Amino acid sequence: MGKEYDRITDKHADFIIRQQLFFVATATADSRINVSPKGLDSLRIIDPNRVIWLNLTGSGNETASHLLKDGRMTLMFCAFEGEPKVLRLYGHASSHQQDSEEWEAHIGRFPRMPGARQVIVMQVEQVASSCGFGVPLFDYVGQRDMLTDWAEKKGGKGIEEYWRTRNSRSIDGEPTDFG
């Protein structure tokens, strides 16, 4: 059933780019575990052991806080249509804000998205596939545009203020890369 790999194969990459949704999990030794759903056109495979994703403004910034302290990250992709499969990428990651060298190196890989907050760069150390037999089937309808519409209405200064007031501390009180 399950198999482990030391890199993202071409077959894995094909599966990943067809998914409309993925999940990001992070934690530190003494924090709550955070799992966040991600969508939109926000993930890129750079090479067999490196992926990046564009982190948009959200109600919290747990991922950035956890990465500052620990760096461990898991990404999970599930097949909600077609053949069942679950694919996990395990590794370490770092968060990079606007105007950083990593941001500048990667932001051009994504379409313009209002509220773009960080580029997350993940070094993939292990890939694991499992059967996905228990994952339900869903019909994909489309991406929601509420987040990008909200960010567009807030404008650049409004988003920056939101980052300072709402995204500078984790739910555990730890600083983020905006703190």
Model-derived segments and their meaning:
Residues 1-179:
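Binding-site signature for planar aromatic cofactors or substrates
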